[in-house]
Swiss-Prot record:
Belongs to the class I-like SAM-binding methyltransferase superfamily. rRNA adenine N(6)-methyltransferase family. RsmA subfamily. InterPro entries: KsgA/Erm, rRNA_Ade_diMease-like_C, rRNA_Ade_Mease_Trfase_CS, rRNA_Ade_methylase_Trfase_N, rRNA_adenine_dimethylase, SAM-dependent_MTases_sf. GO terms for molecular function: 16S rRNA (adenine(1518)-N(6)/adenine(1519)-N(6))-dimethyltransferase activity; RNA binding. SUPFAM superfamilies: S-adenosyl-L-methionine-dependent methyltransferases. Keywords: Cytoplasm, Methyltransferase, RNA-binding, rRNA processing, S-adenosyl-L-methionine, Transferase. The lineage of its organism: Bacteria, Pseudomonadati, Thermodesulfobacteriota, Desulfovibrionia, Desulfovibrionales. S-adenosyl-L-methionine binds at residues 12, 14, 39, 61, 87, 107. It is an enzyme of class 2 (transferase). This is Ribosomal RNA small subunit methyltransferase A. It catalyses: adenosine(1518)/adenosine(1519) in 16S rRNA + 4 S-adenosyl-L-methionine = N(6)-dimethyladenosine(1518)/N(6)-dimethyladenosine(1519) in 16S rRNA + 4 S-adenosyl-L-homocysteine + 4 H(+). NCBIfam families: ksgA.
């Protein structure tokens, strides 16, 4: 009898093969791709990933039981699959070899999905596509447009680094144990104009400032943090000083991050 899902790890195992196949298909796997699966568990997605024929397959598994199972009982004909016992939150995504086309996929635990996507989409060199199943509500936040209720720091960050695509909704009954909410599958394609390392730090800083006080006006949020007049700084960027954070586009946030950093130096 297989072990029960561990609540402490946020495990909800997918049991529908057709949906597993649809999720794997969103990754558009080719023969040259190096694929990382996060949290393979019993291997519902793994089978379809392998069937697509990637050049290499790496399985990141935090659960000792499932890591051991994949070591001892690998899927038939998968000598190229490598099992890594690790927490994906601690994995050094920035060390991926950019010489290879990397694709990342996973049925992500709800409790760590946001920080995982934040790190992977901004730090992984060579990333060409990602596909994740996450809580539907989080997915709605990721694709939210400026001015909407769901739009926030996660929306801005992921839209600055990738082009998120809403794929489809997954109902609770196809999991064991059954979650209380719907899930959604999203795919991510990195942007060619994504922020560099310096811009990323500045963007993260200004997002923290703004969305910790999202109901305040931008001029009030920034006033304690800029060397000059916050209203003038915003006006120079073409931003209404009385605007609130959720009204700014991702591109405006990148520009604002640069301006705030420069004002602190001046």
């Amino acid at each position: 009898m297989p072990p029960r899902a561990k609540k402490s790890l946020g495990q909800n195992f997918l049991k529908d093969r057709n949906i597993a196949a649809r999720i794997a298909a969103q990754l558009h796997i080719g023969p040259d791709d190096w694929v990382i699966e996060i949290g393979p568990g019993p291997g519902a997605l793994t089978r379809h990933i392998h069937a697509a024929g990637p050049a290499r397959l790496f399985l990141l598994e935090k659960d000792h039981h499932w890591a051991r199972e994949h070591h001892l009982h690998p899927l038939a004909g998968t000598p190229e699959a490598q099992v890594v016992l690790t927490d994906a939150l601690l994995f050094p995504w920035e060390r991926l070899d950019a010489a290879h086309p990397w694709k990342v996929i996973g049925n992500l635990p709800y409790n760590v999905a946001s920080p995982l996507m934040w790190d992977i989409c901004s730090r992984a060199p060579g990333l060409v596509r990602a596909s994740f199943m996450i809580q539907k509500e989080v997915g709605e936040r990721i694709v939210a447009a400026p001015g909407s209720r769901q739009y926030g720091a996660l929306s801005v960050w992921l839209q600055c680094f990738t082009k998120p695509e809403w794929c489809f909704v997954v109902p609770p009954h196809v999991f064991t144990p059954r979650p209380k909410v719907d899930s959604a599958v999203l795919a991510f394609t990195p942007r060619t104009d994504r922020p560099d390392a310096v811009q990323s730090k500045r963007l993260a800083h200004v997002l923290r400032l703004c969305f910790q006080q999202r109901r305040k006006q931008l001029q009030g949020i920034l006033r304690p943090h800029v060397g000059g007049d916050a209203s003038a700084l915003l006006a120079e960027l073409g931003i209404d000083p009385a605007a609130r954070p959720e009204t700014l586009s991702p591109e405006r946030f990148i520009a604002l991050g640069e301006a705030v950093a420069m004002s602190a130096i001046a």
